[in-house]
Amino acid sequence: MIKIAPSILAVDLINLKDEVKLVDANGAEYIHIDVMDGHYVPNITFGSNIVKSLRPITNKVLDVHLMISPVEKYINNFIEAGADIISFHPEADDKPFEIIKNIKNKNCKAGIAIHPNIKVAEIAKFLELIDLVIVMTVVPGAGGQKFMDSEVSKIIELKNIRDQQKLNFEIEIDGGVNKETSQICKNSGADVLVAGSYIFSGNKDNYKTLIDSLR
């Protein structure tokens, strides 16, 4: 079954812990944490302290997406805070292979995120080393954007590579995921769907229904 990763980018931060507990109790497998530095992307969001504060309240996968540059100097902070998966944009640092090795050597899963401007061929060299590929279906930097249909071909391409080479990475979709676009992603080969506004702008009593509607 496809996994759902509610994105706390869309949460009212005053109620962050309560909201995470709610989606945890209502079927989410991952909690997605978007980290933005105001440099790689124009927005600024969370640091490793948010991961540290969430770790004691959920045993679900803390799925950290770093939209920062440079990357390497901050990796250990997120590992020590309790991240289960750390994904980054390889073009944002000049040592992507070392970063992947560092993450995995510390019993954390490593992922690569693909900006809409980046082709699958440009990150293919990492695929045998990583646990997750995030296909960005919006331009990184803000929540609530419209799903980019042009990126669906990347999902299909990644699934074909995985099948042909017998690799083990998950394919995660991040951006504009709702009831309709989730089916496109699922049918194209996605394993994990990140959803922020679709879930957290709804009624708290309906979180289970909203999460289940994405499967």
Language-model features, listed with the residues they occupy:
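Hydrophobic faces of well-ordered beta-strands that scaffold small-molecule active sites
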Residues: 3-7, 31-33, 54, 62-66, ...
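Conserved, mostly hydrophobic/aromatic
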Residues: 16, 23, 34, 78, ...
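Catalytic cores of alpha/beta
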Residues: 19-20, 72-80, 118-130, 175-193
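Structural motif
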Residues: 26, 57, 81, 106, ...
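N-terminal active-site wall of soluble small-molecule enzyme domains
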Residues: 35-102
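Glycine/Thr-rich beta-alpha phosphate-binding loop at enzyme active sites
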Residues: 37-45, 49, 116, 124-126, ...
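Alpha-helix-loop-beta-strand connector modules within alpha/beta enzyme cores
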Residues: 44-64, 102-111, 151-171, 175, ...
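Glycine-rich phosphate-binding active-site loops on the catalytic face of alpha/beta enzymes
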Residues: 86-94, 134-146, 188-210
